[in-house]
């Protein structure tokens, strides 16, 4: 699926989501790629079983035009946020992501936008990219995952090695200058309480917000 909606941990095609509930506002999720530069041990790519009709695995990466076609058909009276989040890392398709954010801000300026990211976009592109999101993005949700570089690498198996951890934190600080809401996340069942508290301390020291998110199955 290129675009989808979520309820109770299940992914639905937009038309099916609306058929089941034509009243409640919800997010519209955008799936741009299967590619990811991390290989997290807890990733849904490994653990979640999905029917073919509701799978997030893409046969190919959609073009900007194909995503916009999906946007044009979306039930905007029900949408309260647009979230770029799939089985891959959205910032690996940075130019397409930015073009779609520009389209959304022009056509639906009151709808908040969010990108769920591993925070390694500056490593992937070899430059600072935070300023690219200025005026386009309302929330950046960045996966913190751990309180140390070593534990981070054990969990994420990042293609960039242990240095990915500090790069992710620096990216979060860069994003604070251009994006109103920057949130770092960790997964509850993956981390014991003392590790979660250490992550809180790291976020406090860098003036960043932490969200503990539930493990999805």
Predicted regions located by residue number:
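A generic local structural motif
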Residues: 14-17, 69-71, 126-130
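Catalytic phosphate/metal-binding cores of nucleic-acid and nucleotide-processing enzymes, i.e., regions
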Residues: 21-22, 54-60, 64, 81, ...
């Amino acid at each position: 699926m290129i675009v989808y909606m979520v309820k109770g941990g299940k992914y639905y095609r937009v038309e099916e989501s609306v058929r089941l509930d034509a009243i409640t506002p919800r997010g519209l999720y955008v799936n741009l790629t299967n590619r990811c530069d991390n290989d997290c041990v807890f990733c849904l790519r490994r653990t979640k079983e999905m029917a073919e009709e509701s799978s997030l695995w893409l046969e190919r990466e959609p073009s900007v035009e194909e995503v916009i076609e999906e946007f044009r058909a979306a039930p905007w009276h029900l949408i309260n946020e647009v979230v770029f989040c799939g089985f891959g890392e959205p910032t690996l398709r940075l130019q397409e992501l930015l073009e779609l954010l520009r389209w959304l801000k022009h056509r639906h300026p009151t709808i908040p936008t969010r990108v769920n990211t591993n925070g390694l976009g500056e490593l992937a592109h070899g430059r600072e990219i935070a300023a690219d999101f200025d005026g386009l993005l309302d929330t950046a949700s960045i996966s913190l995952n751990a309180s140390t570089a070593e534990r981070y690498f054990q969990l994420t198996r990042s293609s960039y090695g242990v240095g990915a951890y500090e790069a992710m934190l620096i990216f979060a600080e860069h994003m604070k200058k251009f994006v109103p809401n920057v949130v770092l996340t960790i997964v509850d069942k993956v981390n014991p309480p003392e590790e979660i508290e250490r992550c809180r301390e790291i976020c406090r020291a860098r003036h960043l917000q932490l969200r503990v998110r539930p493990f999805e199955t």
